[in-house]
Each structure stands twice: as C-alpha cells, then as structure tokens.
C-alpha cells in the first residue's frame, strides 16, 4: 500500500508542473552518445510520448555520431576529426545523411509511434527548415568539407506539425541556397530552433550528469548556473570539450527568450520526467539570471 501511496504522491507533485507547461514547446536534443542502450532509448521515447499526452509539445532533435562512425567502419572508411568535428567529404556526407535521416531518425519515429505517439521524421532540408552555410574556421587552412553552420531557421514546417498534433523528430542535416548538403552540430541546431519556436525549454540529453564544478569529479554537479557563470567557467576551463557547444546553445537560447535550459544525463531512466516534473531535478539548469 505504501508503494501505491508514493506513486500517487509523485503524480500530485507533478500537477503544478503539468499545469504550468500545458501547451508549451520543449526542444529536446537527444545525443548519439546516449543511444547505445535500446532499453534506455525506449525509456526516453516513453518520456517524450508522455509529455505529449500531458499537453506539452515536444520537438526532438537527435545526433548519431557513434552510428555514423560504425557505418564508416563497416565500409572501411576512416573517421577523422578536427577539434571534435568530423571531416566530411562528399562520400562521407552521403553516408551521414543515410544514417541520420534514413536509420536513426526513422528508428526513433517508429518507437514513439509504437508507444502511442504520433511522430513525423524530417531533416533540416525538408520545408527549408535549416538554411546552412559551409562552416569556415578562422584558420583558413582547415577544411572540414560538408560541415555546416546554421544561417537561418525557417520553423513553419515544425509549427505545422505541432499544430497537427504530431511530434517532430529532426535530423541535423541542412542545405544551402545553392543546394549543397551539410552535416550540422545537433547542439547548435537545437539551440537555434528553440529560439525560433519561442520554446519554453531547451533540454540536452547527454552522457554526464550535467555540468560539474570540477571537471574531473562527477560528484560536483551543480544544479543551476547563470549565463555569466557559464561564461566564466568556460574561460577558467571548468567547462570544456563537448560540453562547450551545449552550454553555448543554452546561453544563446536563454538570452533570446527561451525560459529555461537543462543539461541531463540521458543514461538515467526517465531523466526527462525526473527533471521536469519533480521538485528535486537531476541535471543542471542554465538560466539568464537568478
């Protein structure tokens, strides 16, 4: 009986959050590093489906780096990186598009639909969603090939899907006005899309428990940071590596009108629900100011 009472209390605890977030849009970035466990993947898709059923409009953007590297290895093609970005020649770009759009995206859509949601998979090329440019380094001698930056987000196709009651699932592949295809950092896409959609929240599901005050100690997670604190920590080297594009996307989002941003460990079952609908939270929230 006590277990049942605790479950009921959990539902009661979620009520004010459900009321506050009803009709709001959450942009959720699901990192490729958290996709390896099929059981956990199912849990995350359950969370997203439940969000839809309680009145939230979830928009899912996914990565897929490990799946791309695995596909390249199966074709005896070496994966090469510069500053964490994949060198993407024309052949690799075709492979990236095939894996992200044709495999990873459709698998996530299929899971959500099987769970009772109505998901539609698209990429940045559909409806002109992501207008991209070639990513240019300050060091002009570095050429990453078909790696792009976001020039413009045209959110109409996503807004129409939300209006129709669907859950958009988006691959971070965009195209230029000239028709060139580009692979774009999914963290960056998520941040810019959240701003364009005037989202209530931007949420990153990654493989660590948020931001740590000591990069070498996972027990030093901080529950919240302001934009100024994040900038300071980047300068001090407390935030580095793959966490940098995530927090930079969070900074842009909250500076441009997104209410809250969160970085969560997607390897924790039901991480989304625990962060959004409980009083405690489990990740790091980044906000404009306290």
UniProtKB/Swiss-Prot annotation:
Its EC number is 2.7.2.8. It comes from the Bacteria. The keyword Ribosomal protein does not apply. It is an enzyme of class 2 (transferase). It catalyses: N-acetyl-L-glutamate + ATP = N-acetyl-L-glutamyl 5-phosphate + ADP. GO terms for cellular component: cytoplasm. Substrate binds at residues 64-65, 86, 183. It is found in: Cytoplasm. Belongs to the acetylglutamate kinase family. ArgB subfamily. Catalyzes the ATP-dependent phosphorylation of N-acetyl-L-glutamate. This is Acetylglutamate kinase. It comes from Halothermothrix orenii (strain H 168 / OCM 544 / DSM 9562).
């Amino acid at each position: 009986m006590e277990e049942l009472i605790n479950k009921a209390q959990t539902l009661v605890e979620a009520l004010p959050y459900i009321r506050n977030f009803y009709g709001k849009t959450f942009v959720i970035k699901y990192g490729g590093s958290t996709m390896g466990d099929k059981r956990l993947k199912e849990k995350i898709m359950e969370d997203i489906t439940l969000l839809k059923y309680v009145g939230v409009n979830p928009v899912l953007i996914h990565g897929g780096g490990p799946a791309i590297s695995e596909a390249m290895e199966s074709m005896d093609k070496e994966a090469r990186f510069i500053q964490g970005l994949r060198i993407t020649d024309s052949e690799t770009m075709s492979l990236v598009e095939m894996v992200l759009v044709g495999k990873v995206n459709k698998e996530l859509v299929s899971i959500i639909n099987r769970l009772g949601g109505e998901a539609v998979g698209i990429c940045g090329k559909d409806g002109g969603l992501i207008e991209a440019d070639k990513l240019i380094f300050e060091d002009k001698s570095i050429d990453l090939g078909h790696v792009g930056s976001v020039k413009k987000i045209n959110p109409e196709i996503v807004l129409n899907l939300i209006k129709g009651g669907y859950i958009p699932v988006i691959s971070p592949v965009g195209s230029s006005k000239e028709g060139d295809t580009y692979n774009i950092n999914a963290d960056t896409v998520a941040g810019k899309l959240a701003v364009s959609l005037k989202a209530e929240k931007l949420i990153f599901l990654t493989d660590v428990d948020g931001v740590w005050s000591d990069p070498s100690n996972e027990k030093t997670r901080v529950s919240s940071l302001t934009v100024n604190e994040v900038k300071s920590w980047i300068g001090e080297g407390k935030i580095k590596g793959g966490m940098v594009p995530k927090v930079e996307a969070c900074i842009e989002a909250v500076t441009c009108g997104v209410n809250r941003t969160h970085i969560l460990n997607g390897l924790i079952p039901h991480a989304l629900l625990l962060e959004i609908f409980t009083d405690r939270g489990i990740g790091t929230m980044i906000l404009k100011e306290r």
